[in-house]
Amino acid sequence: MSAETAARAAVPPTSLPAAVLFAVVFVEGFSSLGAEIVALRRLVPHVGSAITVTAPTIGFFLLALALGYQAGGRVDGDYLARVRRNFLYAAALISLGLAGPVADALFAHLRPVPLAYLVLVGAVLCPVAWLLGQTVPVLTNLLRHERAGARSGAALYWSTLGSFLGSLSLSVLVMQWLGVAAAVLVCAGLLLLVVPFIRDPAAPRWAGVPASLAIAAGAVAVNVVLPQQVETAYATYRVAAAPVALPGMLDPRVFWVNNSVASLIDGSEPPRYSRYIERLRARLEEMGVRNKRILVLGAGGFTLSHRTTTNDYLYVDIDPAVRELAERDFLGEPIRGDFVAADARQFVAGSSARFDVVVVDAYSALTSIPAHLVTREFWRDTRKLLEPDGVMFANLIVDNRLATPYARNLLASIEAEYGRCGVEILFHDRPQSNVLVQCFAGPPPQAGVPYTDEINRADVDILRSQ
């Protein structure tokens, strides 16, 4: 041990009241996990919420946190200044890097999309985890316990308690009632709030205050003053004019959900809608569906029942706010039908009601159907909701040749429960198309047997089919 190191070790570390130290560690746990939750929510409009997105994001976050623990364990002096500086940097990254306009601009201008994802996670979320991860090992040096285990146990208790309350309060309360921007401000604000208390008792009281005020002003400017999309815990919404002229439509308006076109309506009388909605409405008319009960899983803009009175509609969507937003900003009038705020999988699994028609039109982002709504078990539950002569329609967005693994396997999952279904490709001039799938209730028919030159029962089967 060098003389300098020995002298530094002989000087007792500057201490703070235990309540202040535990409060700082609590805020670290709250804001670090809060930043992860906000980052996952910011990713939804751009890359969805599939396990292939959330799992790597959590993994990168934990890796950065582990590296932060290691870096904090190597700090051998000036503990409070280190934590104070880390809190300021983390607050700046959270308030600016996780702001809605910044995330939207990042994904709008960086291509391909995985590059924007890596920038958001690698340049914003991971540095936050690394900075805040240093807090517990650094401040453990200042806790007054007889045993090292008691010190680390107390610090980890308050940090984990903060993470628990942060995940609960931000997801269930703040995002639900105030929006995602409010969650960003809460995470950054708590870090800035404790910065003035992270100082040596002999240091000036205003240590860190000017920087905190500057970061707070920037946070408010980016998360409040700049134009924001309507955000809830589940989705990001906006209503705008169609970005391009649409043939046959007069002043079309688009209801955007998570940066994808959820619904379309124009100013004609009667109004025109998106092609798959018009095709589905026409199909119901052709089938003579009148005075029937129709279940729609995934509300979108509620255009399937717009200005119709011939059937009873029940919409199910996970976001309680979508009805008010659609009525106020998109339709300009009350929806036709009833609305239930629930997860579609949970609803179909627990409902005892029966419907003449079930429409599956649920998307989380772009062309992404939530993963739990594509399984064979989900389609089995939808079939259980149908009347004996009922019909199920599903709006899929897949390649127009139905050749990708996703398209093939999704159709296979549906037909594993329903048997052979009708498939109508609505767009043939673009790689991705709306595909309308129509299936019928009842037990699926027997699997077909190919005709061959050796055994060809085509003529017999024609007679059997008449």
List where the protein language model places each region.
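Class I SAM-dependent methyltransferase Rossmann-like catalytic core
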Residues: 263-285
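Conserved helix-loop functional segments at active or binding sites
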Residues: 332
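Alpha-helical transmembrane segments of multi-pass membrane proteins
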Residues: 2-233, 238-251, 258-262, 281, ...
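Short acidic, gly/pro-rich beta-turn/loop elements at beta-sheet edges
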Residues: 249, 265, 447-449
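SAM/dcSAM-binding transferase cores
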Residues: 431-466
